[in-house]
Amino acid sequence: MTEHPEQQYLDAMARAWYGGDERVDRTGVGTKSLFGVTMRFDLSDGTVPLITTKKIFWKSAIKELIWFLSGDTNIRPLVMQNVHIWTDWPLDKYRKATGEAIDRDAFERRIVDDPAFAAEWGDLGPVYGKQWVDWPRYTPAGDGLFRREEKGVNQIAELVGMLRANPSSRRLIFTGWNVPELPGMALPPCHMTYQYHVAGGRLSGILYQRSCDLGLGFPFNIFEAAVLIRMLAQQADLEPGELVWMGADTHVYSNHGHLVEEQLSRSPRPFPRLSLARKPADMFSYALDDFVIEGYDPHPHIKAEVAV
């Protein structure tokens, strides 16, 4: 019998938790870490790797992906859609800067109700989406100086163009790792570099992550990477192939023991199928209703705290 592809994830989680290197990390929580983990997921049958050993809020993941592709870096559009995955970083910054003991719900209400407050405290800096669709572009201005252009490089649009015009290229890449702009980011990109490969009319992709939180981040990361392949394939008139995932520092947080134990006690269920309801004009015109998930029957959700 063929092993369920989700077992790769469960095995990595077990290896990290029971035998990983115990590390004191930036957050102060501590992790148990592996280095250099690879997983492969077949997308050619229409399924997507949406983790089943706990419920994943896949609509929130789609909303985040659409937000990335919009180039926005402020949490307000996410919070207005009841997506809270990025709130903790600006909330932590606000608390430290003001000393105000505000809870997350109150902070999010102010983000939604007060656009000026959101502009000041809800922005994450030049994170993922900014780099994906508006990577800074500079042109010579004379005397050895350079001028930053108003409109940057849209890596996603250029990628689609290359997939259509030169699908055998080895430069089918986009990245969020912009070294000079890292200090201004609330969190440097974890899922940082994506590369694509076309063979036999099928589009495959590799996602490289410098850092991966197996408990909370990984399920969103692989699902969104798989959805991206489906979107890119649709835009370039290709079929989906395979998702290869590569994690450098692949870890479980020390306060996620209950999550690990519970997930490892559960058996994976069949991955669901993803269909796209329409073909939008471009990568930036997709909406939540365009994504149809069928056959998702996960185990119950497991709550765990995010490390900031």
Curated annotation (Swiss-Prot):
GO cellular component, one term: cytosol
Keywords, in A-Z order: Cytoplasm, Methyltransferase, Nucleotide biosynthesis, Transferase
One GO biological process term: dTTP biosynthetic process
Enzyme class name: transferase
Binding site for (6R)-5,10-methylene-5,6,7,8-tetrahydrofolate: 213, 307
Catalysed conversion reaction: dUMP + (6R)-5,10-methylene-5,6,7,8-tetrahydrofolate = 7,8-dihydrofolate + dTMP
Gene3D superfamilies per record: Thymidylate synthase/dCMP hydroxymethylase domain
Matches recorded under Pfam families: Thymidylat_synt (PF00303)
Pathway note: Pyrimidine metabolism; dTTP biosynthesis
Catalytic residues identified in the record: 190 (nucleophile)
Record GO terms (molecular function): thymidylate synthase activity
InterPro entries: Thymidate_synth/dCMP_Mease, Thymidate_synth/dCMP_Mease_dom, Thymidate_synth/dCMP_Mease_sf, Thymidylate_synthase, Thymidylate_synthase_AS
Main location: cytoplasm
Cellular localisation: Cytoplasm
UniProt family annotation: Belongs to the thymidylate synthase family. Bacterial-type ThyA subfamily.
PANTHER family listed in its UniProt record: THYMIDYLATE SYNTHASE 1
Function: Catalyzes the reductive methylation of 2'-deoxyuridine-5'-monophosphate (dUMP) to 2'-deoxythymidine-5'-monophosphate (dTMP) while utilizing 5,10-methylenetetrahydrofolate (mTHF) as the methyl donor and reductant in the reaction, yielding dihydrofolate (DHF) as a by-product. This enzymatic reaction provides an intracellular de novo source of dTMP, an essential precursor for DNA biosynthesis.
Protein known as: Thymidylate synthase
Species: Rhizorhabdus wittichii (strain DSM 6014 / CCUG 31198 / JCM 15750 / NBRC 105917 / EY 4224 / RW1)
